[in-house]
């Protein structure tokens, strides 16, 4: 005998959640579908509730490998509540499984506009960038569908959601980040990284620092073991007055090469711009231990010294 389903939307959704947690995805999908029909029959205009039900059913389809229905349900969820993170991530995963990499890239990128700390989206962007470079070549960005601009209201809505939503998105963050950093690049990846770094260097010579940052970033996606790529990108951030980013990149560069003089110098410049004179002075001192006669560093030390007193 078929199980008797509850008739109220909240109970149906709760039962669906329970079935999903128990790995009964087909049953969960049926419960979410019934909840949707009940909600629509009531003529209730509750787009958020309806959107969540579509998104939950999409998660069931994804678990069962039914990517096309997952995409369909996510699209319905997003039509009701645009720029919702969960349906965007689920649709991106489904597109990726179907090897529709440009579409997956757009959805992952949209998530990062809403919250740039969502690890699964960062991981997804990295995978899609490599796949698109392989399949479409160096001009792959020109062949992408347009990426929607996320309104500030959508970002505010996400930030005002209960912290559980944020915790769920951040789950296993440190583990995944470590896995990415520890990934050993192949010989092909290293070669590709080198070519992209050189393209970045050429753009710097032409004064196009924004484009150069993109090239260095693509290079680091292929191989994040090159200290010079980080310190070169740091230079671009300095020119664009993005001092915090410059400090981060110099720190990464120095982790890979503790005697990278340019990284010490650029981090000292960034610290000085951020009025962190103590850290700036420490970086110059470390630099001068490696290169005691470095003229620009000696000059910068004098400038920083004046601000220390």
Curated annotation (Swiss-Prot):
GO terms for biological process: protein targeting to mitochondrion. It is found in: Cytoplasm; Mitochondrion outer membrane. Its main location: cytoplasm. Residues 161-189 are annotated as: Disordered. TPR repeats lie at residues 9-42, 51-84, 86-118, 193-226, 227-260, 262-294. GO terms for cellular component: cytosol; mitochondrial outer membrane. It is a peripheral membrane protein. Keywords: Chaperone, Cytoplasm, Isopeptide bond, Membrane, Mitochondrion, Mitochondrion outer membrane, Phosphoprotein, Repeat, TPR repeat, Ubl conjugation. There is a cross-link at residue 197 (Glycyl lysine isopeptide (Lys-Gly) (interchain with G-Cter in SUMO2)). The modification Phosphoserine is found at residues 160, 186. It comes from the Eukaryota. Residues 164-178 have a biased composition (Basic and acidic residues). Pfam families: TPR_1. Disulfide bonds: none annotated. SMART domains: TPR. One of its GO terms (molecular function) is heat shock protein binding. Interacts with HSP90A, VCP, ATP6V1D, KIAA0665, AMPK, and DMAP1 through its TPR repeat. Plays a role in the import of cytosolically synthesized preproteins into mitochondria. Binds the mature portion of precursor proteins. Interacts with cellular components, and possesses weak ATPase activity. May be a chaperone-like protein that helps to keep newly synthesized precursors in an unfolded import compatible state. Belongs to the Tom34 family. This is Mitochondrial import receptor subunit TOM34.
